[in-house]
C-alpha cells in the first residue's frame, strides 16, 4: 500500500461546524510530514501533471507551499505563492477565496499575460479556492496548463460545472468517522 493512501487511512477526523475534516500532514502540517511521504507525492505529481513548457507553479498559501517547493526543486520551475496579504505591487491581482469554512481575500503577483502555469494545491474540497485562482489567472491572460490537487474530498465542488479538469492523486470521503478511499489513483 502506498504511503499517501495509508497516511489518509490513518488520519484523525475532526468536526467543525458540522463539517468533517481529516487532519493530515499535507493539508494541515500535522502530524509531521515524513520525507518519504513528500517524496512519493512529488514523484506522482511530476508524473501526472502537464508540465510541458510550464513557466510557473502557482500555489495558494499556506499548505500548497511545501508541495510546490519540492516540485520546483525537482523540475526547476519557479513558484508563485498566492498570498493572503496585499503588497500593492504593480500587476497584483486580488481574488476572493471561499472555502467550506472561511472567506478571504488573496493576492497574485508575478503572473502575466501569456505565462503558462500549473496550479498546485493540497486538497480539493469545496473547490472555492481553485475556482477563484483559475478565474483570476484567466483574467490576467495566463494559460492554465494544468490544475492538480494532491487529495480530492468527495462531494460537489465549484469546479464541477466548469470545463476546468483537476487532476488528483487520490480521492477520499469521510464516513462514519474515518477516511474512505474512493479512488487510489485520483482523477485523470
From Swiss-Prot:
Keywords: Purine salvage, Transferase. The keyword Transferase applies. GO terms for biological process: purine ribonucleoside salvage. GO terms for molecular function: transferase activity. Its EC number is 2.4.2.-. InterPro entries: HGPRTase-like, PRibTrfase_dom, PRTase-like, Pur/Pyrimidine_PRTase. Belongs to the purine/pyrimidine phosphoribosyltransferase family. Archaeal HPRT subfamily. May catalyze a purine salvage reaction, the substrate is unknown. PANTHER family: HYPOXANTHINE/GUANINE PHOSPHORIBOSYLTRANSFERASE (PTHR43864), XANTHINE PHOSPHORIBOSYLTRANSFERASE (PTHR43864:SF1). This is HGPRTase-like protein.
